[in-house]
Amino acid sequence: MAKRDILSVLDMKNDLDEIINLSIELKKNRYRSYESLRNKMLGLIFEKPSTRTRTSLEVAIDQLGGHAVYLNPSEMQLGRGETISDTGHVLSRFLDAIAYRAFDHKNVVELARSTSIPVINALDDVEHPLQIVADFMTVKEKKGKFSGLKFSYIGDGNNMANSLMLGAAILGVDIYVATPHGYEPKSEFVDKAKQVAKERGSKVIITNDAIEAAKDADVIYTDVWISMGEESKRGEKEKAFTKYQINSDLVSNAKKDYIFMHCLPAHRGLEVTDDVADSINSVIFDEAENRLHSEKGVLYKLLSY
């Protein structure tokens, strides 16, 4: 079977909907015993902290009959100067796949180039593809469809914004991205998303108007304003994003049955207020749970051969 990497949401362009449907089926049969990945070994290399991604990946591979090996970069020879390429060649001899959470996307690409096994981007500075499977799985569960939905991301034009645009475009969802001026998503991702959206009959709208994005939205999504590694920008970003907080006033512009989503962790009182995060419209913990089921879907798709 040919090696397949998932470094970007675009690597699931042809089967994202299929993976989501598989994930929903795996969730429905969560108490069934699976041995489809028996004896398969997943390596986890995490340069950044993780609660949901690491835990869900470890549980996911275990529930499918395989095993996870956590590799702390500071305890590997990577931390002493061994190249990513050499590391990839060696780990390919021991493992069946690697999930890599990195500060720099270039390192994820380099690892994938040097391995003979699948590499999964478990979050880097430009994308978070695993989160997208869980997010749109949640949308499918709550809304029952993708076509005709207005999905609004309001916040920083970061890695989540990049990946959400691509995921929405692939699935035919209209997406609005509202950010302060100067914090828009990278143009290369906007261009890629618009090209896919054109093919799939949906649209990608970039705006600086949070109310425009929230108006009649079916989904309102946000993420932290200060990403990992950006702590020095806290004061600057908090000032710039004040009008982009997800609060009761802003969501009053959305449809009454809108759902609120957040990839977590949430900085309550900054990008979202408690009354929204804890409202009946909030699905953030269902969304978090779906990290497990969606990653089972991804791993099954990559490794069940």
From Swiss-Prot:
Enzyme Commission number, as recorded: 2.1.3.3
Pfam family, one: OTCace
UniProt-listed InterPro entries: Asp/Orn_carbamoyltranf_P-bd, Asp/Orn_carbamoylTrfase, Asp/Orn_carbamoylTrfase_sf, Asp_carbamoyltransf_Asp/Orn-bd, Orn/put_carbamltrans, OTCase_ArgI
Organism of origin: Thermoplasma volcanium (strain ATCC 51530 / DSM 4299 / JCM 9571 / NBRC 15438 / GSS1)
Reaction(s) the record says it catalyses: carbamoyl phosphate + L-ornithine = L-citrulline + phosphate + H(+)
Protein name per Swiss-Prot or TrEMBL: Ornithine carbamoyltransferase, catabolic
Family: Belongs to the aspartate/ornithine carbamoyltransferase superfamily. OTCase family.
Major enzyme class: transferase
An individual GO BP term: arginine biosynthetic process via ornithine
Binding site for carbamoyl phosphate: S50, T51, R52, T53, Q77, R101, H128, P129, L130, Q131, C263, L264, R291
